[in-house]
């Protein structure tokens, strides 16, 4: 039993409309891909959903080339058909506006693709081209990152060398100042030693004087501490006899 004919009118049910759009879009992209391969034709397909979502297909590696070719062809054809200059100016502005708008939309679409979004409508060939572009971009990013890291490392090494040299110079200056300080200190000590007066020698005592000073003193009225009482009585006797002896000698001398 064959498939019935579908009535060409807007589908009111949103779910059915979305399902039909997805199926027909996939079939349309498949047909565009088949005709580009079978007939060696340059095919480009642009589809916007009712929500404004873009779906496209291009047999070339880049959609921009196809759009630029289309614009040049359309512009040349319109120039031949429109003799009035005023009309040509308006047409040029309209074409420029359309071209810039299409370019902006294309850039936005490419940006979404680079972010990994809206990849459902892209063919295998376009995915391969996108992957190659991303790999090339990653190589450039890694190369730039390595260059910056290398420059930063060299800068840190130069700074480290400068700090080490400055530290060495400061250490040398400290040692020189310490040496000068020690020299001044030694000179001051030598000057203090030279100005210091040497102690005078103690006088030598006569042994006879030491013996005489060490002898006990006579005490007429008492007893010398530490002496024997017998010795005290003998001293008193000597003192008593000495005047008598002196008197007798004087008498005989007369």
From Swiss-Prot:
Compositionally biased region (Polar residues): 182-191
Top-level taxon in the UniProt lineage: Eukaryota
Family annotation (InterPro entries): MADS-box/MEF2_TF, MEF2-like_N, TF_Kbox, TF_MADSbox, TF_MADSbox_sf
A Pfam family that the UniProt record links to this protein: SRF-TF
Domain K-box: 90-180
GO BP: cell differentiation; flower development; positive regulation of transcription by RNA polymerase II
GO annotations of cellular component type: nucleus
Region of interest: Disordered: 182-205
Gene3D superfamilies, per database record: Transcription factor, MADS-box (3.40.1810.10)
Protein's UniProt name: Transcription factor CAULIFLOWER
Protein source organism: Brassica rapa subsp. rapa (Turnip)
Lineage: Eukaryota, Viridiplantae, Streptophyta, Embryophyta, Tracheophyta
